[in-house]
């Protein structure tokens, strides 16, 4: 596959940054689609070119596909903001990119989906993503769909609960997952695209039960593991009730995470970084930030 220029959509996100770095290291011309070029530059995004535009607004994309051979989109919203819905971003924004890619005769469009999407069609986030994948597959363009089991960045909730002293799990805690590091996933994406693969279900090198993941979080904090198992009926009940008692900004991501917690999320093993290393990095980073805070000096007592 002889490609030289890649447009990365979602370039300022967790995975997008790793993809930009991966393709820069491979010597490609990387055009990063960003909402604010100055902010992206200040945040340390190192791409060949920053193209300022919003995928939700097709008028801002004029010229984005010029000379592009490959589009990689990680666009999606896990936590809703700016008044945009999953259908606005996960579906329509990607559809706008696809329309422009087709008009520009881009060779291939790669999209980051989610593992086990077919089992979560009732979840709005997943439904919007799957609708775009269906449109992509129906389009006359070569495509690669990558379905990761979960990102390391999504595992922070386990560490946060452990930090508070107790991790709560639904059911036995024996369901398995193998989340993957962003840099490892970027390598998978580049390899799959180069090989012309259509669909890649992928996860990290280590498959853990939810219990083991919780234990790893406690170990990183040097705390004794305290895990409470809630009856799974609570999780299933929350899936039914949350849409009626919380705004979409709350129940949208909750429905996805609660659904994923109710099944095995194990993709094809790849990579070298383990979750325990990620937890250790997070703990170290928090400690360094705490140490860097200026110390408050206490005024000495007056001598009388």
Where on the chain are the PLM-derived regions?
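Glycine/proline-rich active-site loop of Rossmann-fold NAD(P)-dependent oxidoreductases
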Residues: 153-160, 191-200, 223-225
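Non-catalytic, hydrophobic alpha-helical segments
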Residues: 15, 71, 185, 189, ...
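N-terminal Rossmann NAD(P)H-binding glycine-rich loop of SDR-like oxidoreductase domains
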Residues: 4-26
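Glycine-/Pro-rich loop/turn segments that contact NAD(P) or position catalytic residues
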Residues: 77-163
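A hydrophobic C-terminal alpha-helical subdomain
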Residues: 232-304
């Amino acid at each position: 596959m002889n490609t030289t220029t890649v447009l990365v959509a979602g370039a300022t996100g967790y995975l997008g940054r790793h993809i930009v770095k991966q393709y820069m290291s491979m010597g490609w011309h990387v055009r990063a689609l960003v909402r604010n070029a100055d902010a992206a530059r200040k945040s340390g995004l190192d791409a060949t070119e920053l193209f300022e535009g919003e995928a939700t607004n097709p008028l801002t994309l004029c010229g984005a596909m010029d000379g592009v051979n490959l589009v990689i989109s990680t666009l999606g919203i896990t936590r809703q903001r700016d008044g945009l819905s999953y259908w606005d971003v996960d579906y329509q924004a990607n559809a706008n990119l696809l329309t422009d890619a087709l008009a520009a005769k881009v060779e291939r469009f790669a999209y980051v989906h989610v593992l086990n999407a077919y089992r979560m069609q009732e979840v709005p986030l997943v439904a919007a993503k799957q609708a775009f994948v269906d449109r992509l597959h129906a389009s006359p363009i070569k495509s690669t769909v990558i379905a990761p089991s979960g990102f390391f960045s999504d595992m922070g909730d386990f560490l946060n609960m452990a930090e508070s002293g107790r991790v709560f799990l639904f059911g036995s805690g024996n369901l398995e997952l193998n989340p993957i590091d962003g840099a490892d996933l970027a390598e998978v994406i580049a390899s799959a695209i180069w090989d012309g693969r259509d669909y890649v279900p992928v996860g990290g090198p280590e498959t853990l039960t939810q219990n083991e993941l919780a234990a790893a979080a406690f170990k990183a904090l040097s705390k004794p593991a305290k895990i409470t198992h809630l009856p799974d009926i609570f999780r299933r009940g929350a899936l039914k009730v949350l849409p009626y008692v919380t705004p979409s900004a709350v129940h949208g991501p909750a429905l996805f995470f609660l659904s994923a917690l109710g099944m095995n999320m194990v993709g094809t093993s790849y990579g070298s970084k383990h979750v325990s290393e990620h937890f250790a990095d997070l703990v170290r980073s928090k400690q360094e930030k705490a140490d860097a805070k200026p110390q408050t000096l206490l005024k000495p007592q007056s001598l009388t």
